[in-house]
A protein has these predicted regions:
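Conserved hydrophobic "DFG−1" position in protein kinase catalytic cores
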Residues: 26, 34, 100-101, 128
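Acidic, metal-coordinating catalytic segment for phosphate/diphosphate chemistry
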Residues: 1-23, 158-159
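Conserved Nudix-box catalytic region and its N-terminal flanking loop in Nudix hydrolases
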Residues: 31-71
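A short coil-to-beta-strand element that immediately follows conserved catalytic motifs
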Residues: 75-85
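Nudix hydrolase/Nudix homology domain
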Residues: 42-44, 118-163
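Active-site-adjacent beta-strand/loop module that shapes the phosphate/pyrophosphate-binding cleft
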Residues: 86-115, 127, 150-153
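Residue-level preference for beta-strand/loop junctions
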Residues: 16-18, 43, 93-95
Length: 163
């Protein structure tokens, strides 16, 4: 073990900070709800599962419920929200993404229709896409996570090995 010096102490005292993204994996009959990004300045026109950033002192479940209401316009039951996948972005972007899901029998009877954008305007429209046939124009790290989730993996890294 190397002795502690002023240089190593200073280097290790700077804490790494992550941006935490919360995505919704809303799956119905093998189809995933994806939104087309709009008015965000990043990836506009590309598809991804509805998402938002984790707020200070907010739990992942609270964030998922908030994102569902704000982005999609639906109410999720916090007791039914579960963790489906985690993606660690090691590209240098400093991001960790948690993908949460809920049983979607409520969506089929709740009067919500794909295509309706939520109140925040981060998405221009929504649609249901087969997990086995995702749109070509999709945010890369979201595609990696969704493919791994569909294959049964609970964790992935981005960029994925071989990308």
């Amino acid at each position: 073990m190397q002795p502690l010096t002023a240089e190593t102490t200073a280097r290790h005292s700077r804490h790494f900070q992550l941006i935490v993204d919360v995505h919704l994996l809303l799956v119905r009959n093998g189809d995933l709800l994806l939104g087309r990004r709009a008015n965000t300045g990043y990836g506009d026109g590309a598809y991804e599962p509805p998402s938002g950033r984790l707020a200070e002192r907010e739990t992942l479940v609270e964030a998922a419920v908030r994102v569902a209401a704000a982005q999609v316009g639906i109410a999720l039951d916090p007791a039914r929200v579960t963790l489906a996948h985690v993606l660690h972005d090691v590209s240098g972007a400093g991001r960790m993404a948690f993908f949460l899901t809920e049983d979607l029998d409520l969506l089929t009877t709740g009067g919500w229709a794909a295509g309706a954008a939520g109140p925040t305007g981060s998405y221009s429209d929504f649609g249901w896409y087969p997990l086995t046939d995702l749109p070509a124009n999709m945010i890369d790290r979201a595609r990696v996570a969704v493919r791994n989730y569909a294959a049964g993996a609970r964790f992935s890294t981005y960029p994925a090995f071989g990308m």
